[in-house]
């Protein structure tokens, strides 16, 4: 199947997927702990019959049972060498079932999911290794005859991108992708539905959507959000409600086919046009939704508005149109002219990069430009490190800025959002090499109207260059909305008409539907009091239609002027933005005054008087003598390192704190523990997501490793409470379990982590040998949660007094109560609170 054929196939009527595979195989006798693909091949008729029933029920796209048939997952069963033959035989089952069609077209989708290994910086997996793993599986699926590919049940947008990139590089099959969202409308890694939809459509997915986690009604908001920012078909593949265990310990779901079908109407109304079922659904579910919606044409829901552009990080989307409010692309993460930043980058230190990112976001930037162009460093490696560090402290979308195509390609490949590329000109190398790369990764780009001949001699030549690049972009599948034209600002000191020419370019671009950008500082080069010139020019440019500018958002006069101009032009919500910014200006001034007072007081303590200079700031060079206690300042610095997840810098900060006279026990109890507790609160409130939680926990762990020898030297002999933690037998998921272990360690527990797929006997034996106060159990699958019941019962029978706490995606408080566990934890932060409460 070609992508064009897929578009034609899905354009008029609702399309039907199949329902659950795993829960039906369990009913048919598949035990937990086995390799699902191997069991299917050993019980071929069971799978064939199930898929034939789906086809008879009305399925148009049948998922081949290759869900975890990748090298990493199969290696857990020592079957990785059999991957190719296994995939070939598994796809053959689905092809045979699809051939038994009752008269409607049926296509077989090669099924792909997460590997279970996490990408850097949260895990150890490198992006290129992950892409290679997916390529191996995809090539096997293509060779086996899959008609299309499905990437499903994804919790990570970055890993979903890796799968799409792999597919794009080895085949031309259409790829559909669905992610799994939590109750808060975000994936486990913090991506919302709009952001996922924008990124995956721009990367070339033929259809996108959601599967698993919830029943149909709870999926409505996710589907609506995806529909509102895309033009491709939207998939809805919900569970049959919520799981529970019946009196026999069998996993069941709380929705019957009739109720499920009724609720699916909500998703159809929201704009879903490809329907199916996930956990707990059967061929009868598919039959009923097919009977309900089979002859209906697609519901026309509100799709992506005309002319709206989208830039994203991994976690948020910034949308804008030509008549929306002006915004700033922060320019400060650029070593040009910044000696301190250059020195840090040569040392591999990214503290100032992080500082500039945080400051620019606080000052109102909506996008951050990242430029690592300088001598004496590996620019590509520094760019990738900067992306990692900046993405860890801000959710703002990024602009990728380099003179080298290979640097931009590496950045686009690794960046897990939709970036802005700065920039593409008509210069031969960038035009011929860079533009196809931008198109491949679905980015937006700044169109710089330069050619090999240099600057255009007049506005007409500038227009000609713009349209040449635009035409080439269209031929690569891009749209006008993917382009931001640079107005090419020259200095008014050398060319008195420079401002007028740029303003004419801006007006021309807006009238022709192009977004625009410019670098403000060029206009005032070599002029006195440059800020006045920049601000006046910005006012004129916004009135002419300027969309955004690359500038320093910490310049209050410039930012205030921009927001006031929007206000006077009566742009939507301009008054609210102006009032909000003005309030922030007041707060920042008060903070500066307080900082001034604090530093003056510190100097006076040493008998040094410093008179105010008329400014509200004191140079950062003004510090107290080295022998001055800096307890408050050092504590705040260490706390910030935990809150920001500064894994690399916190060791240095901890050592500095110790050298300044801080006591290890006070750093632990008064700084680190309160900081990580605050991180947990932010996570509970939805301010932080899994990446920030992991980064902060690892930062704290690195700090504790410095303190631990000093703490042990002077401790009172009090033993730490022992926790034996494991993912139960048959379950190979450990993301959540690993984080719980890390958080418990950070709070002073002695954690014995047994890993994943751990037999009951080993868990109980370890608990007895180590006199554990707690046994912590994790399960992600409904097929393995029964192991928890068995462990609780066995522990009581053997007289083990350790308190048993449980958690995992399918676990609830009700289930914990039912099996007699001592507690249930919904996440890592909650696990710490639970353990402490059970010790009281």
What are these regions (language model features)?
Residues 1-484, 490-840:
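Domain-level signal for soluble alpha/beta catalytic cores
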């Amino acid at each position: 199947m070609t992508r064009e054929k897929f578009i034609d196939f899905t354009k008029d009527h609702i399309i039907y997927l199949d329902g659950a595979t795993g829960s039906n195989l369990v009913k048919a006798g598949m035990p937990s702990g086995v390799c699902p693909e191997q069991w299917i091949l050993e019980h071929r008729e069971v799978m064939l019959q199930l898929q034939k029933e789906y086809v008879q029920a009305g399925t148009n796209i049948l998922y081949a049972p290759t869900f975890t048939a990748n090298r990493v997952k199969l290696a857990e069963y020592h079957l990785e060498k059999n991957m190719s033959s296994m995939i070939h035989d598994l796809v053959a089952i689905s092809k045979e079932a699809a051939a038994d069609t009752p008269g409607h077209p049926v296509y077989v989708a090669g099924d792909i999911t997460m590997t279970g290994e996490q990408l850097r910086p949260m895990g150890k997996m490198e992006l290129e290794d992950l892409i290679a793993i997916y390529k191996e599986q995809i090539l096997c699926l293509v060779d086996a005859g899959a008609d299309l590919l499905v990437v499903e049940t994804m919790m990570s947008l970055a890993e979903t991108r890796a799968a799409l990139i792999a597919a794009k590089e080895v085949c031309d099959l259409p790829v559909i992708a669905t992610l799994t969202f939590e109750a808060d409308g975000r994936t486990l890694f913090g991506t919302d539905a709009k952001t996922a939809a924008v990124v995956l459509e721009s990367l070339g997915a033929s259809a996108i959507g959601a599967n698993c986690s919830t029943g149909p009604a709870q999926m409505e908001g996710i589907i609506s959000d995806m529909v509102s920012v895309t033009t491709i078909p939207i998939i809805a593949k919900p569970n049959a409600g919520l799981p529970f265990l019946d009196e026999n310990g069998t996993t069941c779901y709380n929705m019957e086919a009739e109720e499920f079908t009724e609720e699916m109407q909500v998703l159809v109304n929201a704009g879903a046009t490809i329907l199916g079922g996930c956990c707990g659904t059967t061929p009868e579910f598919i039959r009923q939704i097919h009977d309900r919606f089979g002859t209906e044409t697609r519901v026309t829901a509100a799709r992506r508005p005309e002319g709206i552009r989208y830039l994203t990080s991994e976690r948020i989307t910034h949308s804008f149109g030509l008549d929306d409010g002006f915004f700033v692309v922060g320019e400060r993460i650029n070593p040009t002219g910044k000696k301190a930043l250059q020195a840090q980058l040569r040392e591999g230190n990214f503290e100032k990069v992080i500082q500039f990112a945080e400051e620019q976001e606080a000052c109102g930037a909506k996008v951050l430009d990242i430029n690592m162009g300088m001598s004496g460093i590996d620019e590509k490696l520094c760019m990738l490190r900067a992306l990692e560090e900046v993405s860890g402290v801000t959710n703002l979308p990024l602009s990728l800025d380099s003179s080298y195509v290979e640097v931009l390609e590496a950045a686009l490949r690794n960046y897990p959002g939709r970036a802005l590329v700065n920039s593409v000109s008509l210069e031969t190398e960038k035009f011929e090499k860079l533009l196809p790369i931008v198109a491949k990764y679905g980015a937006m780009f700044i169109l710089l109207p330069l050619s090999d001949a240099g600057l255009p001699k007049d506005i007409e030549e500038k227009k000609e260059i713009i349209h040449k690049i635009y035409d080439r972009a269209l031929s690569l599948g891009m749209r006008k909305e993917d382009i931001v034209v640079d107005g090419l600002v020259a200095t008014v000191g050398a060319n008195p008409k420079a401002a007028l020419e740029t303003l004419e370019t801006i007006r021309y671009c807006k009238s022709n539907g192009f977004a625009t950008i410019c670098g403000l500082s060029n206009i005032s080069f070599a002029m006195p009091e440059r800020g006045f010139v920049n601000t006046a020019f910005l006012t004129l440019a916004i009135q002419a239609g300027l969309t955004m500018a690359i500038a320093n958002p910490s310049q209050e006069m410039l930012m205030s002027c921009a927001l006031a101009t929007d206000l006077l032009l009566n742009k939507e919500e301009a008054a609210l933005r102006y009032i909000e910014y003005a309030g922030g200006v007041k707060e920042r001034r008060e903070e500066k005054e307080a900082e001034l007072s604090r530093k003056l007081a510190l100097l006076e303590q040493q008998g040094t008087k410093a008179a105010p200079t008329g400014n509200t700031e004191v140079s950062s060079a003004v510090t107290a003598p080295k022998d001055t206690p800096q307890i408050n300042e050092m504590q705040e610095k260490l706390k910030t390192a935990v809150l920001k997840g500064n894994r690399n810098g916190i060791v240095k900060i901890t050592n500095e704190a110790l050298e300044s006279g801080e006591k290890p026990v006070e750093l632990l109890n008064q700084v680190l523990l309160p900081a990580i507790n605050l991180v947990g609160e932010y996570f509970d409130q939805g301010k932080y997501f899994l990446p920030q939680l992991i980064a902060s926990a690892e930062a704290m762990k690195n700090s504790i490793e410095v303190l631990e020898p000093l703490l042990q030297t002077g401790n009172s002999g009090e033993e730490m409470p022992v926790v034996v933690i494991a993912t139960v037998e048959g379950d190979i998921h450990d993301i959540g379990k690993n984080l719980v272990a890390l958080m418990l360690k950070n709070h002073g527990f002695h954690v014995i982590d047994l890993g994943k797929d751990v037999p009951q006997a080993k868990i109980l034996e370890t608990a007895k040998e180590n006199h554990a106060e707690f046994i912590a159990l994790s399960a992600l699958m409904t097929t393995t949660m029964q192991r928890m019941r068995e462990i609780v019962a066995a522990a009581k029978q053997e007289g083990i007094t350790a308190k048993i706490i449980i958690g995992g995606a399918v676990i609830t408080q009700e289930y914990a109560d039912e099996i007699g566990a001592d507690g249930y934890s919904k996440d890592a932060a909650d696990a710490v609170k639970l353990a402490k409460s059970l010790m009281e």
